[in-house]
Amino acid sequence: TQEDIQNSGAKTAFDAVSNVPGVTINSFSASGADFGGMDSRTNIRGLDRGALVLVNGIPMNLNGKSGIGAIPTSAIERIEVVKGASSTLYGAEALGGVINIITKTPSKEGGSATVAVGNRGSKRFDLSYGTDRFLFGIDRKYWGAQDPSTPVRYDYTGRKGYDYYTTRNKGNSLGVFMSGKLSDKVTLNYNRAESRSSFGLISTETNPMRQAHHSTTYNYKDDRNNVSLIYKDDNTTGTLFYNDRTMRGESRVHSAKQFKPTDTSYVARQYGMDVQHEWDFRGGKDYLIAGITGKQETYRATQAPVYTRPHRNTYAVYSSYSREINPKWTAILGLRYTAISDPIKDQHVLTPQFQVLHTINKDSSMYLNIGKAYTMPSLSDAFRSVNRQYTAVSGKNLKPEEGWNYELGYKRMNKKDSWKVDVFYMDFKNFFQWQPDANGRPTVRVNGGKFHN
């Protein structure tokens, strides 16, 4: 809840989700900001890239990354976390679960301002203001350079002939959030995130000329935009959404004077829509949710000698039926069919889910959850730079990462406390791994072994 988030001291959504049991975070930069191509990660139940992140029900995952470090807590109403395979209602990438960040909606006039200053060049400025029709928030953060603190990276293969360590230079980030009520049923949301980061790979050689020749500084400009138009009445919800990310990198060998663009620069975009309706039966005891969704993902390498523009189209129909067997027992059955037009190989995926809920008393309940989930490889995974030429490097037999989640749990919630305990088993196959190309670089995405937890 909003009160829990405030009491935790979290500054961003990235900080807030770290307090949820079973959710782990990892960030290479300050305050959860992405560090160039080294993205911050949000994982559920130990599964890397297994969390689907939503904002107001809109998918934030873009090219396999979510990036929630730029959403200030001043813009958040609450955060919902659903653990376990959840592809039936939410689609791809929900192998470990779903994190849904619900932002504040315009309700009343008022605002807040925060100024914070810390060590190592840390500064933060946060401002938010809203009326009954419009809400605006901005969050600006700065961080200074850090002394080398990472361990020396050893040249185990002996190919380079030198070791090196990493440094983090000063940087900053900007988060902007706006929400406006166009009518009582229509809301328009916009979020922009900017990050400016820099780091160095510094040779440990003592010879100044050799050290300069083998040391490199990298600068990154990372911009994201997220727009959603949401219609909601008593039984129907419809959304239109657009996400993009522009990554621009440059590097300079210390023996050279000028920076040069890196071949990891890219532009990724996602367009989509979702419409769902709910029907009630037997006086509200039972209900059926059914919907359709469609989206297109695109990826463009902006600095590669040969430009590539792979894209993926995804269409799905889904439904979930809840049946009250008696006041103590409820069963839920869901099914989703997804058709994927993919540049590597078209896919057709069925993801069922079965749940049983048992109410013990007004505070306690037990549940059983069995569900299937899947995720597709990122477009940038399938198209990599080989000999400075972007090409499709994954084989036509590349399959989605998919599997089952089995879970039995107990939860208790009241005004004084809430707690939950469960036993789960995750069984996934076609786990994504990297395979070396002809030059020994790990650039070829393949299906490897299995994941169990």
Predicted regions and their residues:
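N-terminal periplasmic accessory domains that precede
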Residues: 13-16, 40-43, 54, 66-67, ...
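Extracytoplasmic beta-strand/coil segments of soluble accessory domains associated
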Residues: 14, 18-58, 77
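Short acidic/polar hinge/loop motifs at secondary-structure boundaries
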Residues: 41, 58-83
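Extracellular loop and loop/strand-boundary signature of outer-membrane beta-barrel proteins
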Residues: 63-64, 110-114, 157-166, 203-219, ...
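Short strand-turn segments of transmembrane beta-barrel domains in outer membranes
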Residues: 104-129, 164-170, 399
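Periplasmic-side early beta-strands and strand-to-turn transitions of outer-membrane beta-barrels
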Residues: 116, 128-220, 430
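Outer-membrane beta-barrel signature, preferentially recognizing the C-terminal barrel domain
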Residues: 118-120, 213-234, 266, 345, ...
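Face-selective signature of the C-terminal outer-membrane beta-barrel domain
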Residues: 135-136, 181-195, 219-352, 357-359, ...
